[in-house]
UniProtKB/Swiss-Prot annotation:
Swiss-Prot/TrEMBL catalytic activity: ATP + H2O + 4 H(+)(in) = ADP + phosphate + 5 H(+)(out)
Membrane topology label: Peripheral membrane protein
GO cellular component terms attached to this protein's record: plasma membrane; proton-transporting ATP synthase complex
Protein name (record): ATP synthase subunit alpha
Subcellular location(s) of the protein: Cell membrane
Record flagged with keyword ATP-binding: yes
InterPro entries: ATP_synth_asu-like_sf, ATP_synth_asu_C, ATP_synth_asu_C_sf, ATP_synth_F1_a_nt-bd_dom, ATP_synth_F1_asu, ATPase_a/bsu_AS, ATPase_F1/V1/A1_a/bsu_N, ATPase_F1/V1/A1_a/bsu_N_sf
Site (described: Required for activity): S362
Entry's Gene Ontology molecular function annotations: ADP binding; ATP binding; proton-transporting ATP synthase activity, rotational mechanism
UniProt keyword ATP-binding present: yes
Alphabetized Pfam families for the sequence: ATP-synt_ab (PF00006), ATP-synt_ab_C (PF00306), ATP-synt_ab_N (PF02874)
Family label: Belongs to the ATPase alpha/beta chains family.
Species name: Limosilactobacillus fermentum (strain NBRC 3956 / LMG 18251) (Lactobacillus fermentum)
Protein purpose: Produces ATP from ADP in the presence of a proton gradient across the membrane. The alpha chain is a regulatory subunit.
Amino acid sequence: MSIKTEEISSLIKKQLANYQDQISVEETGTVTYVGDGVARADGLENAMAGELLEFENGVYGMAQNLESNDVGIVILGDDTAIREGDTVKRTGRIMEVPVGDALLGRVVDPLGRSIDGLGDIKTDKTRPIERKAPGVMERKSVSQPLQTGIKVIDALVPIGRGQRELIIGDRKTGKTSIAIDTIINQKDQDMICIYVAIGQKESTVRSQVETLRKFGALDYTIVVSASASNPAPLLYIAPYAGAAMGEEFMFGGRDVLIIYDDLSKQADAYRELSLILRRPPGREAYPGDIFYTHSRLLERAARLSDDLGGGSMTALPVIQTQAGDVSAYIPTNVISITDGQIFLDADSFYAGQRPAIDAGTSVSRVGGDAQIKAMKKVSGTLRLDIASYNELAAFAQFGSDLDAATKARLDRGERTMEVLKQGLHAPQPVEQQVVTLYALAHNYLDDVPVDDVLRFESELATFMRSNHQDLYDSIKQSGQLPDGDGLDKALDAFKAGFQTSDQKQDASVAQN
């Protein structure tokens, strides 16, 4: 049997035509140390800062320290299966998380993996967790209100869409409650909410998720949880992961509210990582770039220009203080980065004034431009009234001999403080707040006993919804107080039929 030369030649040519030259080049290194959520590896000379690295058991890490002889890596997962001598390879990518509508209503970890037992998250869109914040010309001034549903905030410390407003106070003073109530109040407001829980107990996060579900708020909320049992690197990246998820909606022209609860624990996690990586410690043992850690995160909150879709991301970072000390390192850093702060006072909280917001030290630097005109009118003198009352109340403790004018101001102050009280998970629509504060400002509460003030407010809201819904609608749609004397007439009619507790008791005795 003879084989023709032409056949051999054509076979070789066919094989050469079908040959695909696929060379896979991987830059790998060797783990030289592992422990406390951190690894060191040599042989990764070209690794980039923030690059995602993969260990041979499938766990990922992020390059943090680029040194002359090795790379410091923070491990984004369980480090118990990683051993000295293991291989680690470059991926050429920076850390990314899944984003999009598929995450709404879900509870995820900082890597975007489902932890709520409802199966995998089906989305093919991802975003890098680190992104340069929008520049000056890419932004628009804050001019639209974000209603929290909490009277004292919407009246005295208004928040605008795209603002960064710090919630600061000691532990157990109601910081998280304000954040959760604000999320609940965004129902039917076309607002996407992201709640980032950093370093909290898993039972606490579960309770907050159930609260959101109970009020129908989980449908438009993403919960990112890095619990206290997670490694420090996950606590550190959690806020950045939440911001990346929010940016997907913001650049799509949507409005986003993101809550970081709380950044004190993120700072502690970053301090832990930095000390293990042997970075030089600074004040309170925090690394030198702790300010940048928070500023680059909070600067990502913005209201975008119309050219970029006009979306917004409003940030409410939470900071925990020790014994009310706002002059500590992390609190002063975040106060200087944000556009204002809501300060919660422990003494007021334990005295029953809840929410325990200190009107004197709480401020909103840009939210006033976003406040509706009706609220501006009815809350104009509120801050001064509270300051005057607190001063007089402190003075009145030393003696009971007060003149009539001083006593009248004290009585009015007591009613003002009572009006500003609000129950847990009971946010109010802005039109209801306006009518309540209008009644306070126009002396409708002056002869109502302090114990009856909250009942007066509740019954007034029911009366207005039943008989004068048009006035509520007018305030909601126009943002202005109703024209004419319609509101005064409605309040007069309600006041005429309102019975104080004493009057009810007298009527009951008379019937018997």
